[in-house]
Curated annotation (Swiss-Prot):
Source organism of the structure: Aliivibrio fischeri (strain MJ11) (Vibrio fischeri)
Highest taxon, organism lineage: Bacteria
Any GO MF annotation of the entry: urease activity
Name of the molecule in the record: Urease subunit beta
Catalytic activity: urea + 2 H2O + H(+) = hydrogencarbonate + 2 NH4(+)
InterPro entries: Urease_beta-like, Urease_betasu_sf, Urease_subunit
UniProt similarity note: Belongs to the urease beta subunit family.
SUPFAM superfamilies listed in its UniProt record: Urease, beta-subunit
Keywords: Cytoplasm, Hydrolase
Main location: cytoplasm
Enzyme class: hydrolase
Amino acid sequence: MIPGELRVNDDLGQIELNVGRTTQTLSVANYGDRPIQVGSHYHFYEVNEALHFEREPTKGFRLNIPAGMAIRFEPGQRRTIELVEFAGKREIYGFQAAIMGNVDGHITATISDDKEVK
């Protein structure tokens, strides 16, 4: 083997991601004046409010792209994207704190500009 050489088993073919999970296609527009980049595992319901789309159906979904990748929305740009449901326990914490727990039986917090920690 040569240092840095990659040996790939071509017999494996293509690797399919997120097989059997619910997906949805969505049109998203950036109404802001700056580019917005969204990472692969960011809870799409909680993305920057300058991105306009119907939010409610996106609870519990993320971008259907490989881990570590992102999609960039330029100002004024409209894109059609595909989302995939979160799997596992479907517990979502952090982001903008809109859902702090199980997405299927969540308690919704209000997304606001109030930065005070209580």
